[in-house]
A protein has these predicted regions:
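Residue-level detection of the helix-turn-helix DNA-binding "recognition helix"
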Residues: 8, 12, 26, 37-39
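Short alpha-helical DNA-recognition segment
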Residues: 15-34
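A short, Lys/Arg-rich alpha-helix, primarily the initiator
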Residues: 1-13, 51
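Residue-level recognition of specific faces of alpha-helices
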Residues: 6, 31-34, 46
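Short, charged recognition helix plus adjacent turn
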Residues: 44-45, 58-75
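Short, basic-rich loop-to-helix N-cap that marks the start of a DNA-contacting helix
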Residues: 39-52
Length: 75
């Protein structure tokens, strides 16, 4: 699963918009949109924010996807 797919799935599970996710993560809507379209991936600091957000919501986010992004591997 790509990072883009994981973010789309996360929003779907939470039933929130790109805007709502952006607000929760303190990032721009454009950033969420670029992630979902596979144009960019988050930096390491933002990955930690995503992890914490998922943990706070008891969401089993695709952490293997996060680890591959951390290592610079692209799916």
């Amino acid at each position: 699963m790509t990072f883009a797919d994981s973010i789309i799935q996360l929003r779907s599970e939470l039933r929130i918009s790109q805007k709502e996710l952006a607000e929760q993560l303190n990032i721009s809507v454009a950033t969420v949109n670029r992630w979902e379209n596979g144009r960019t991936e988050p930096n390491k600091m933002t990955l930690f924010v995503i992890r914490d957000f998922c943990k706070s919501k008891n969401i089993a986010f695709a952490f293997d996807t996060l680890k591959s992004v951390e290592r610079g591997e692209h799916n």
